[in-house]
Amino acid sequence: MDKLIITGGVRLDGEIRISGAKNSALPILAATLLGDEPVTICNLPHLHDITTMIELFGRMGVEPVIDEKLSVEVDARSIKTLVAPYELVKTMRASILVLGPMVARFGEAEVALPGGCAIGSRPVDLHIRGLEAMGAQIDVEGGYIKAKAPEGGLRGAHFFFDVVSVTGTENIMMAATLAKGRSVLENAAREPEVVDLANCLIAMGAKIQGAGTDTIIIDGVERLHGARFNVMPDRIETGTYLVAAAVTGGRVKVKDADPSTLEAVLAKLQEAGAEITTGPDWIELDMKGKRPKAVNLRTAPYPAFPTDMQAQFIALNAVAEGTGTVIETVFENRFMHVYEMLRMGANILVEGNTAIVTGVEKLKGAPVMATDLRASASLVLAALMAEGDTLIDRIYHIDRGYECIEEKLQLLGAKIRRVPG
């Protein structure tokens, strides 16, 4: 397994381009199964999860065509099997997203119960109950979800999500595009990635209103046609590089970004003492060599502070002036990075869903281990400002969500290299 070796203490300075959003690209790829003509998706990030989704399509008989710019054309008419097998699904939770489109378009699906990041219970029952409300018959047996549409296809339904679920909202919204009649999804996720998926579906001919609010209305149509669609910029990758500059007292300009999707994060960075300037598709952060100030934050569904930026801000607080409290309300068991940071000399106390972080002057390099995607990114940030060398193991977690992380950080001046395990 590859490792990263980072020599800390370098003030980052420079410009980088932001990749397409993984959390938007995966549902949008799943949505291509709904089309009865080829659909082309552009600005896909070059990530392991994307490769897994494309491999899953290949296993089902859909052979995506990939060009040199990593645009992917999918023609779902060539599908041969409606099974998403365990050996692919186990590595990536997002593979559950093919369930709704397959049942809606082909009348049945068999999808293995998913794997992915080990951060608490992320139940798939909302996906199942949403499809059942639309008339699907679903059995869970042998580790597989087996779903069948009623005769005549799925029917529009009024569905209330007990818990805000991004992938649940996406799956049911996709299924509803081809259902007969109107579907109303209440307490729906409002994330920008949900809006991006809705925009892609609309480009394919779907009738969707209210994406980005907590009530989404979908009027089913007979068919969805081909389209060409650009995936939105990755707001979590954007935030991570902004924090990287902030913790090192440096400056960064991120291009091909979307400031409107990051308001809660930008507000906290300003509170930490960063000077921030934005344009239509860029953000510049400058710490002017200063040490950040500790911030208090509480994660919650969009538009509040994103859980996927929590670990990065714990790294920021770890070297900030003062004490900051971080409350995690979205996932349980999401402070695994804290125990690795303690090995580097951080002063962090975890009580239930709260981490109390008192900043220290300097962290010290140490061997650490990545446990999940965002936790691993926070260890990279901690290493960038630590004294000496940090060796980060199990970085396949990082590769699931960050395209070319070492190359981008090298562009900003970081001393970072990948070594084979």
From Swiss-Prot:
Pathway of action: Cell wall biogenesis; peptidoglycan biosynthesis
Molecular function, one GO term: UDP-N-acetylglucosamine 1-carboxyvinyltransferase activity
Biological process terms in GO annotation: cell division; cell wall organization; peptidoglycan biosynthetic process; regulation of cell shape; UDP-N-acetylgalactosamine biosynthetic process
Pfam families: EPSP_synthase
Presence of keyword Cell cycle: yes
E.C. number(s) listed in UniProt: 2.5.1.7
Sites bearing 2-(S-cysteinyl)pyruvic acid O-phosphothioketal, chain numbering: C117
Binding residue positions for phosphoenolpyruvate: K22, N23
Coiled coil regions in record: none
Residues reported in the UniProt entry to bind UDP-N-acetyl-alpha-D-glucosamine: R93, R122, P123, V124, D125, L126, D308, V330
InterPro entries, per the entry: Enolpyruvate_Tfrase_dom (IPR001986), Enolpyruvate_Tfrase_sf (IPR036968), MurA_subfamily (IPR050068), RNA3'P_cycl/enolpyr_Trfase_a/b (IPR013792), UDP_GlcNAc_COvinyl_MurA (IPR005750)
Similarity comment: Belongs to the EPSP synthase family. MurA subfamily.
Name of the featured protein: UDP-N-acetylglucosamine 1-carboxyvinyltransferase
Organism of provenance: Ectopseudomonas mendocina (strain ymp) (Pseudomonas mendocina)
